[in-house]
Design a protein with these regions (language model features):
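An amphipathic, aromatic/His-enriched active-site/gating alpha helix that lines ligand/cofactor pockets
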Residues: 32-39, 56-90, 143, 163-207
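Short, glycine- and small/hydrophobic-rich beta-strand elements in well-ordered beta-sheets
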Residues: 30-51, 55-59, 137-166
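Tyrosine-centered aromatic motifs in long, intrinsically disordered, low-complexity repeat arrays
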Residues: 6, 18, 44, 53, ...
Length: 215
């Protein structure tokens, strides 16, 4: 399985039109996804940002006809947004903890977050998260987090996490303290767009919302 992502910024005053056009192309888009074995496709929004996530068979290459269809669908939307990611190129994977991926999504909830890196801080962000991977070592995360990945493009960070609700528990005092220390340090290198740490900072940000999903 190959994980793929994309990111865009909706043009000022165009969010209603973006949603409308997404609805107009949706039946054709679903057929396109199914023909090309694209799974777990979702589109997320916070403020004027859009983040998309999906999964494909590894090393899949679209046929000429399907590439033409992809471009045709994109053209019908593109007046409403500017690309953050580069079409046809993967976003940079900054962190992953895929763990045990749940094939059945009925008992998972999503956490999708967005931040803006401060100038020159992309490598420091990557270094800190590489440290988490090194600390984890060969341990496979059983849950509740699963299929967790963080991506970057254009100075933005986008996180995608599938959380098994049957395994969630109240955090211990040690876990709370680690989170506070980690998120406080992260504020040195990035600013939040979504509301994930409003409880810590006292600020008020947008929640990420799912605009669309297709299994």
């Amino acid at each position: 399985m190959e994980r793929c992502t994309f990111a865009m910024k909706v043009k000022e005053g165009k969010m209603n039109e973006y949603r409308k056009r997404l609805g107009e192309i949706w039946p054709e888009l679903v057929l396109f996804l199914d023909r090309n074995q694209v799974k777990n496709f979702s589109i997320w929004n916070a403020e004027n940002l859009i983040f998309g996530y999906y999964e494909t068979v590894e090393n899949t290459v679209l046929s000429t006809e399907e590439e033409h269809m992809r471009q045709k669908l994109t053209v019908r939307m593109e007046e409403t947004f500017d690309w953050i990611s580069t079409p046809g190129e993967p976003m940079r994977l900054m962190y992953h903890d895929f763990g045990v991926v749940r094939e059945n999504k009925e008992l998972i909830r999503h956490r999708v977050f967005m931040t803006k890196l401060k100038p020159g801080c992309e490598e420091e962000y990557k270094r800190r998260h590489d440290g988490l991977i090194e600390k984890r070592g060969d341990t496979v995360t059983q849950g509740p987090d699963s299929n967790f990945s963080i991506w970057s493009s254009g100075g933005y960070i986008f996180g995608y996490n599938e959380i098994d609700t049957t395994m969630e528990t109240e955090p211990t005092e040690e876990e709370k303290q680690f989170t506070i220390e980690w998120e406080t340090r992260q504020l040195e290198i990035m600013d939040w767009i979504t509301n994930d740490v409003d409880w810590l900072t006292g600020e008020h940000h947008a929640a990420s919302i799912r605009l669309a999903w297709h299994a």
